[in-house]
Amino acid sequence: MKWLKQDSGNFEDRRGISGGGKALLGGGAIGIIVLLLNIFGGETGHSIGNILQQTQGSETGEQTQTRALTAEEKELGDFAESCFVYNTKTWTTIFDENNMTFEEPGMVLFDDGVTTACGSATSAAGPFYCPGDKKIYMDLRFFEELQSRFGAKGGDFAIAYVIAHEMGHHIQTILGTSRKVRQLQAEKSEVEGNKLSVCLELQADFFAGVWAHYNQELIEAGDIEEALSAANAVGDDAIQSKTSGQVQPDTFTHGTSEQRMQWFKKGYNSGDIKQGDTFSALLN
């Protein structure tokens, strides 16, 4: 990916810092609670894409620098921040074109654990968006596991895709889509609620594709393949097959590998947010 360093006042790099919150989320069955978190990644041994559980008794404390970042880590952080800025610029333009006002989210890089307005999480939760504080949270070491454990190609555009996917969840929060889904899920069975989650996640993949469409000047040969490889690796069917050897469609919350690639490509090829109604396409 062709990129130049971009800076944002809404970007925080907390890597190498301890304190500022006690990570309470570890393992076990994770369910839907008050705030639905649209998780991209997940926990080893559990389906990538689980819902993050809100925790109680989160502790806050003084933050202290515990280690210096390596040059490679700093560059990766600069890349993530730049992708975040490219996303905010693109969605500001799209919202302007549709006579809407875009509210810029925040983004936080962290190591090991983090406390958010939606609760506390370990890195095992994977990248996620918290609607409570409208911030994207990410431990960049997730992408090492994406390659080594789930077979993604890797590459910088895989990171760009995930950031764009999480930005898609912010778009859904602004538009009220996430709130409507939570309301509907409260009235549905678990299986029907899972189908709504799949629609929400695939729409975020579609929005990631729309972002890529608007940023053709940044894309190099092989970049789209990196994004599709990441999407393929985190399909519910692919993850369940690798982690348990069994595929249970009724438990899907993010969609199959094929669906995730399909909706990203649709967004990328069209660049038209009006074509991203995954709910009508999948539920009717």
Regions found by a protein language model. Name each.
Residues 60-77, 142:
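Acidic/histidine-rich, surface-exposed loop or edge segments in extracytoplasmic proteins
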Residues 1-67:
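Long amphipathic alpha-helical segments used for membrane anchoring, targeting, substrate engagement
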Residues 234-284:
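Pan-zinc metallopeptidase signature
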Residues 173-201:
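Post-HEXXH active-site segment of zinc metalloproteases
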Residues 91, 138, 161-174, 204-205, ...:
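Active-site recognition of the HExxH zinc-binding catalytic motif
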Residues 74, 78-102, 192-195, 199-240:
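Short helix/loop segments within enzyme catalytic domains
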Residues 113-139:
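Catalytic zinc-binding patch centered on the HExxH motif and its immediate surroundings
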Residues 142-161, 192-198:
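Short pre-active-site segment immediately N-terminal to the catalytic Zn-binding motif
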